[in-house]
């Protein structure tokens, strides 16, 4: 039997038999402050099964059934002393544990001192950071107000120019409408001239230069009217686009004014202001729909769109002024050409009428002479009948001569020759009488035709000179043709 107190070569210091002990229960992680790291004492003989610590509870050890009871050799030590012998430390472990405690305390104090210094510095840094952030935000709000003011001035300037351009465009539109209505008067005059000239008679219904100029004048006036009205319609559409651009500028300007009021209110807020309060979660809500680039681009696009609309309006106004100048010049030139054609035609008709009157006078003279000639021929024929009767009577009487006295003597020969001569003379005179009568009939017909032609020419002169030229004495002046009333 071995006694207590022997060396470690004793049987109770030999290899420990497996007793089938259950493992320690799992412990819950302790709730400790940040940066705290638990430490443990060194030593392989450290037993958590019986020694309580700061973070573990004493676990109940369930002993396993004695497996050695079945062996023949009894235990060499008492069970009550075995746990006490196994739980003892060496002096080295004790010293090392004390040193660790001291070093742990010094580390804790050093960490606490550093934490205190870091906390002071953190407070100073965070106060300075908060103040700098607030000052920076205030500066940003001021810069934002400056940007808003800049774009407001740009939008206001562009809006004023657009409104002025709209007024100018409205004036040009009214001028176009007035000029188009003013063309109705000369157009009606030209149409009336064409209607009156349709009342010409006979050969005077000619497609002359006057009619060509009148048709060109009507077409030109209608074309001018159509061009003015089309341009007025284009200007009306442009004015709609201008109003859209104007509404966009006004909306943008109103939004900028509202944003400026809000940002001015935010700019003037201080830590001591009465109207400040907590609005938790506002930093997590992103209700923005633009960034500074797109924000500036939006206003810039509105201004560029307005500038494009103004450029289109200026081009339309220049086109309208050019159209006024061109059309008024064309209408005046065509009106003058038509009047010149009228004057030339009236002169031609007057010349022809004078010639016809001259021919009529000569025809009447020829008729008078023909009638005298007929009268002389009739008298001459009647005068030749007496000698013919005498000659024929003489021949008839000489036929009663008896027998050989019926001689073809010189008197007989002369009488026969006289009868033939007088008869031939009568036939010639009668033929000339018929020719003269035919000529007289022709002259009478010519006189009728001349009188008819003179009546036609008089009607033509009345239409062209009195009716048409009477209406064409006046023409709208240039200021009225360009829309100035």
UniProtKB/Swiss-Prot annotation:
Transmembrane segments: none annotated. It is found in: Cytoplasm, Cytoskeleton, Flagellum axoneme. It comes from Macaca fascicularis (Crab-eating macaque). GO terms for biological process: cilium assembly; flagellated sperm motility. It comes from the Eukaryota. InterPro entries: Tektin-like (IPR048256), Tektins (IPR000435). Belongs to the tektin family. Keywords: Cell projection, Cilium, Coiled coil, Cytoplasm, Cytoskeleton, Flagellum, Ubl conjugation. The gene is TEKT5. Residues 113-185, 225-251, 342-385, 423-443 form a coiled coil. Ubiquitinated, leading to its degradation. Deubiquitinated by USP16, promoting its stability. Sperm-specific microtubule inner protein (MIP) part of the dynein-decorated doublet microtubules (DMTs) in flagellar axoneme. Forms an extensive interaction network in different conformations that reinforces the helix bundle composed by other tektin proteins (TEKT1 to TEKT4) and MIPs to anchor the tektin bundle onto the tubulin wall of A-tubule of the sperm flagellum. The keyword Ion transport does not apply. This is Tektin-5. Microtubule inner protein component of sperm flagellar doublet microtubules. Interacts with TEKT3. The keyword Secreted does not apply. GO terms for cellular component: axonemal A tubule inner sheath; nucleus; sperm flagellum.
């Amino acid at each position: 039997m071995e006694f207590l107190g022997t060396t470690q070569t004793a049987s109770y210091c030999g290899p420990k038999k497996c007793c089938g002990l259950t493992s320690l229960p799992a412990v819950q992680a302790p709730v400790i402050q940040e940066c705290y790291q638990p430490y443990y004492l060194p030593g392989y003989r450290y037993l958590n099964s019986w020694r309580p610590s700061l973070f573990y509870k004493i676990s109940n050890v369930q002993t396993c059934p004695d497996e050695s009871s079945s062996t023949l050799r009894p235990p060499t030590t008492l069970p009550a002393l075995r746990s006490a012998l196994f739980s003892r430390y060496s002096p080295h472990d004790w010293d090392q544990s004390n040193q660790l405690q001291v070093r742990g305390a010094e580390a804790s104090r050093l960490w606490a001192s550093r934490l205190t210094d870091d906390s002071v510095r953190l407070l100073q840094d965070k106060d300075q950071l908060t103040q700098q952030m607030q000052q920076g935000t205030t500066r940003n709000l001021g810069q934002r107000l400056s940007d808003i003011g800049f774009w407001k001035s740009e939008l206001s300037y562009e809006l004023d120019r657009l409104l002025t351009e709209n007024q100018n465009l409205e004036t040009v539109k009214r001028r176009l409408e007035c000029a188009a209505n003013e063309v109705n008067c000369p157009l009606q005059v030209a149409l009336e001239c064409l209607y009156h000239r349709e009342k010409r008679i006979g050969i005077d219904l000619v497609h002359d230069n006057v009619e060509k100029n009148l048709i060109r004048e009507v077409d030109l006036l209608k074309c001018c009217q159509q061009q003015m009205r089309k341009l007025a319609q284009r200007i009306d559409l442009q004015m709609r686009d201008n109003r859209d651009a104007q509404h966009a500028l006004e909306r943008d300007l109103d939004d900028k004014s509202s944003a400026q009021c809000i940002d001015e209110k935010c700019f003037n807020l201080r830590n001591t202001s009465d109207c400040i309060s907590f609005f938790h979660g506002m930093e997590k809500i992103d209700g923005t729909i633009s960034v500074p680039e797109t924000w500036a681009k939006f206003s810039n696009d509105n201004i560029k769109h307005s500038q494009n609309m103004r450029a289109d309006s200026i081009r339309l106004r220049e086109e309208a002024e050019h159209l006024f100048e061109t059309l008024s010049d064309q209408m005046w030139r065509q009106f003058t050409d038509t009047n010149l054609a009228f004057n030339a035609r009236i002169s031609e008709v007057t010349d022809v009428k004078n010639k016809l009157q001259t021919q009529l006078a000569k025809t009447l003279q020829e008729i008078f002479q023909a009638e005298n000639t007929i009268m002389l021929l009739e008298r001459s024929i009647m005068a030749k009948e007496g000698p013919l009767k005498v000659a024929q009577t003489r021949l008839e009487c000489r036929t009663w001569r008896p027998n050989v006295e019926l001689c073809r003597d010189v008197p007989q020969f002369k009488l026969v020759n006289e009868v033939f001569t007088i008869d031939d003379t009568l036939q010639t005179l009668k033929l000339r009488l018929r020719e003269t009568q035919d000529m007289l009939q022709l002259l009478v017909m010519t006189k009728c035709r001349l009188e008819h032609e003179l009546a036609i020419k008089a009607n033509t002169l009345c239409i062209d000179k009195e009716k048409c030229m009477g209406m064409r004495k006046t023409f709208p002046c240039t200021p009225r043709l360009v829309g100035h009333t």
